[in-house]
Curated annotation (Swiss-Prot):
This is Protein LTV1 homolog. Residues 24-53, 77-113, 175-220, 399-453 are annotated as: Disordered. Keywords: Coiled coil, Ribosome biogenesis. Residues 185-217 have a biased composition (Acidic residues). One of its GO terms (biological process) is ribosome biogenesis. One of its GO terms (cellular component) is cytosol. Residues 412-467 form a coiled coil. Signal peptide: none annotated. The keyword ATP-binding does not apply.
């Protein structure tokens, strides 16, 4: 059998290479547990050297792997790019009569279709998932100041007004607190007190007419007309349960407090918004556009002064006002002081040493302090020093004559055992003599010091005993 070349499983020219990377934090599926956290990123097949050479032609000299050419496009008229191309090709078929016909030829699609979940999302959010979860720093204007103070440990817990009583729940449910809250309400004028015994306006909370007489006098119950109740609210996110629950006095009081709280954030005047961008299309023959133009011309006509209504006196007044404005215009002129100018001779004199003698300023030496002996009270280094006595000179000569050359501690290469033994013995004797000499020197210096101290004490006593006549 002839050898047939096997078709490769993957064709390198038509193959697409992907990189397995982590999903972006701005991807909406980053927080989805069911979606894979790693996606496929198509690899760029373009030659790096060729791309960098083309970038240098356009003036881009950055030495990195980023493709800056993707932000460039050719100058010219805009053209329409079709969203999808047809996968069918046409081939020409010639009949026996010589007629040519085009017949569509279907091209098979890709053999492998990857799901969209393995790729990154087409749309990304402006803020990533980690930045959303980052802690908020700085001023929190949307929080209660008392809560912010408590979090920052600036809340005064010792103030009696900031402390709750043990029975604060009973105090909140008491009749006195409800009555005082109703008296302080600014919207009490919108309600009408109705006697419970009246037949015309006797309604219960459900809106039905009550035929029973609940009592008269001090125990009579006050109710309000439903038609006069303000039903408009600033809240738009009521739950399903709150819309059907019967509003008792506590819930009504809570609603009123929320209404009062949100009244503080109402805008008295709502004007035009800044930097408003309007997009859209309006016909030039539109009636709305004509109304806007007419309103503009009417407003301009009101602001301008017509010639028939302008008198000569008015014209003179306007001229005089313009003259006064011209006279009143004042300009502030800053006059700078003239700088000192140097001529050629003066500036050259600073470079010569004819009149300029630069030198280093020396620090004068400090005066030497007089040191006084603690024992004698006499200034030191004043009396002349005494020389050595005959006994001291004899001792020094004996010490100098007793000096012997030191024995070498380094052995020779050709040293025998007897020589080494003799050398070690000599070293021991030398060290012994040195110790004896050192001890004798210490004793001699100690005796000399004690003798000098005694002489100084005697000298001090003799000086104090002198009497000047």
């Amino acid at each position: 059998m002839p050898h047939r070349k096997k078709k490769p499983f993957i064709e390198n020219k038509k193959a697409v290479t992907f990189h397995l990377v982590h999903r972006s934090q701005r991807d909406p599926l980053a927080a989805d547990e069911t979606a894979p956290q790693r996606v496929l990123l198509p690899a760029d097949k373009a030659d790096t050297e060729k791309r960098k050479e083309e970038q240098r032609d356009f003036g881009v000299f950055f030495d990195d792997d980023y493709n800056y050419l993707q932000h460039l496009k050719e100058r010219g008229p805009s053209e329409l790019i079709p969203s999808a191309t047809s996968k069918s090709k046409s081939c020409i078929i010639t009949d026996q009569d010589g007629d040519k016909e085009k017949e569509p030829q279907h091209v098979p699609g890709p053999s492998i279709n990857l799901p969209s979940s393995v790729f990154a999302s087409e749309f990304e959010e402006d803020v990533g998932l980690l930045n959303k979860a980052a802690p908020v720093r700085g001023l929190c204007l949307d929080l209660d100041p008392d809560i912010v103070a408590a979090l920052d440990e600036d809340f005064d817990f010792d103030d009696p007004e900031n402390q709750l009583d043990d029975d604060f729940i009973l105090q909140a449910n008491s009749d006195d607190l409800r009555r005082s809250s109703h008296e302080k309400d600014d919207d009490d004028d919108d309600w009408e007190d109705v006697e419970s015994g009246s037949e015309e306006n006797d309604y219960d909370s459900d809106g039905t007419v009550s035929d029973e007489d609940d009592g008269e006098g001090d125990g009579a119950r006050k109710e309000f007309l439903f038609m006069q109740e303000e039903t408009k609210s600033r809240f738009t996110e009521y739950s399903m349960t709150s819309s059907v629950i019967r509003r008792n006095e506590q819930l009504t009081l809570l609603d009123e407090r929320f209404e009062k709280f949100y009244e503080q954030f109402d805008d008295d005047e709502i004007g035009a918004l800044d930097n408003t961008e309007l997009e859209g299309f309006i016909d030039s023959n539109s009636g709305r556009l004509e109304e806007v133009i007419n309103d503009y011309y009417k407003q301009k006509a009101k602001d301008c002064v017509k010639l028939k209504n302008l008198t000569p006196r008015d014209g003179m007044d306007s001229v005089t006002e313009e003259d006064d404005e011209d006279k009143e215009d004042m300009q502030t002129i800053v006059i700078e002081e003239p700088r000192e100018k140097w001529d050629c001779e003066s500036i050259l004199s600073t470079y010569s040493n004819l009149y300029n003698h630069p030198q280093i300023i020396k620090d004068p030496p400090k005066a030497k302090l007089i040191r006084v002996s603690v024992k004698t009270g006499i200034p030191m280094d004043v009396l002349p020093g005494r020389g050595l006595t005959a006994k001291q000179v004899e001792r020094m000569e004996m010490i100098n004559s007793s000096d012997i050359p030191r024995v070498s501690t380094h052995p020779r290469k050709d040293e025998s055992k007897e020589e080494r033994k003799a050398r070690k013995q000599a070293i021991k004797e030398e060290r012994k003599e040195r110790r004896v000499e050192k001890k004798s020197n210490k004793l001699a210096f100690k005796e000399e010091k004690s003798r000098q101290v005694k002489e100084q004490l005697n000298l001090k006593q003799n000086l104090q005993g002198l009497k000047l006549s």
